[in-house]
Amino acid sequence: YILVLFSLICESLICQCEEGFTYNNTLPNNINILLGDSCFYNDDLEGLADLISINNLEYDNAFGIGTQSWFNGRLKILVAGNYGNISGVNDTIFSLPESVGNWTSLSGLYLEWNRISSLPSSFENLKELRSLYISNNILEGVIENLDSLSNLKYLDLGYNKINQLPISICSLAELQYLWLFNNNLSSLPDCMCDMNIDWSSDDSAWFPFFAIGGNSLCENIPECISNSENFNVSLDQFYYSFQ
């Protein structure tokens, strides 16, 4: 009786959400609440629902896709790689909707092993993003104003079809890891040597801070990169991960 009474009180009074948030206390196991209650930001949910819809993924609602971590009602981390296990998606993601730009509190995005060919212009809104893993897709490029992702620390673009990098990449002052191996790059912006990246070293887990092997770089290569001990490094696509 006490539990039933508490539930009724919660639903009628305590658990009402602020405007713009939706209450849901029946969550699947793939949802992690890092901090907060069961109120979820509507715009974040819209981005998830649109991602499901445009790719014809078989999920009942926005909470079904991937592994999601929420912080005070905002989507903080989304793991939606096509790994072939329950941590990612149950089918391939081919495109990202403009509404992913709603995820303005997102800090980690994992989209490996899909078939994504481009990033929507709204991607520039993800200013809190610290980790972007989108290897093993079919990206031909990235957003021009990449510097809008000013908090980016980890950027994995390996195993795509990228043929050119925007100059704006040089303004990513917080970037520590940059993986560009196995793309179609034939040239690089000269300003890359102004970036605060350790071009030749590995971290404590033996991952290189920078790697760019498997491209078509032959001439007009910035000196910091041509002299890098990791110039020809390419990690095995089936075994590496920062996760």
Where in the sequence are the language-model features?
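Bacterial Sec-dependent N-terminal signal peptides
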Residues: 1-19, 133, 156
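N-terminal capping/linker segments that flank leucine-rich repeat
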Residues: 13-98, 206, 214-243
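Leucine-rich repeat
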Residues: 72-74, 102-105, 124-129, 146-152, ...
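Conserved hydrophobic beta-strand positions in leucine-rich repeat
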Residues: 78-80, 109-111, 129-134, 153-157, ...
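Extracellular repeat-rich scaffold modules on cell surfaces
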Residues: 90, 101-109
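Consensus "Asn ladder" position of solenoid repeat domains
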Residues: 91, 114, 134-137, 157-160, ...
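The feature encodes a structural signal of leucine-rich repeats
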Residues: 96-101, 119-122, 140-146, 165-168, ...
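Ankyrin-repeat and related helical/solenoid repeat scaffolds used for protein-protein interactions
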Residues: 156-159, 163-203
